[in-house]
Amino acid sequence: SKSVDRVVFEHVSFQYPSADAPTLKHIDLTFKNGEKIAIVGENGAGKTTLIKLLCGLYAPTGGRILLNGKDTATIAKNSYFDLFSAIFQDYYFLPMTIQQNITASLDYDREKFDLALQKAEMYDKVYALPKGTDTLMDRNVYKDAVDFSGGEKQKLLLAKAMYKDAPILILDEPTAALDPIAENQLYLKYSELTDGKLSFFISHRLSST
């Protein structure tokens, strides 16, 4: 089922194959449903490594990660990935329509899609475009594609996360491209929209949290 009671890191270590020393060493952490967790640290401090372990993109080189008491190594990858909506700092939109980028499919729930756009405050902007949700993205590929600002792209990523509606939400440096005021507004929005979920906010700026 798509419910998460708790996630536990038990003595987790991780070392990249080419590294001389572990990035993370004997980490013990417990995260419970409904918590909002801020992970703050300098670049290279292991923040993203921790999150990729949590998401199942990396496997621990020591220790284990438990979901509701079950070792995540024994859970089928696809069903585990379904538990996460993640917005990573290096995410790029695909050269497809706005609708396809947000819903990741041709067969989608229109009402849920519109609600996700509204929550992310992009509904009016998208529907004001001549082709609306069928507008193509990525001007490098299509000359008639829409060119959204950094802040608008972040809001569309938020809409994508809202549409997936997974129990664990991860925002990895989602505001790096924004000025402090816009960043603060976006974090307040994230905080409001993540009520009832286990959410992680990763930043290298303490002010963001």
Language-model features: locations:
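ABC-type nucleotide-binding domain
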Residues: 2-209
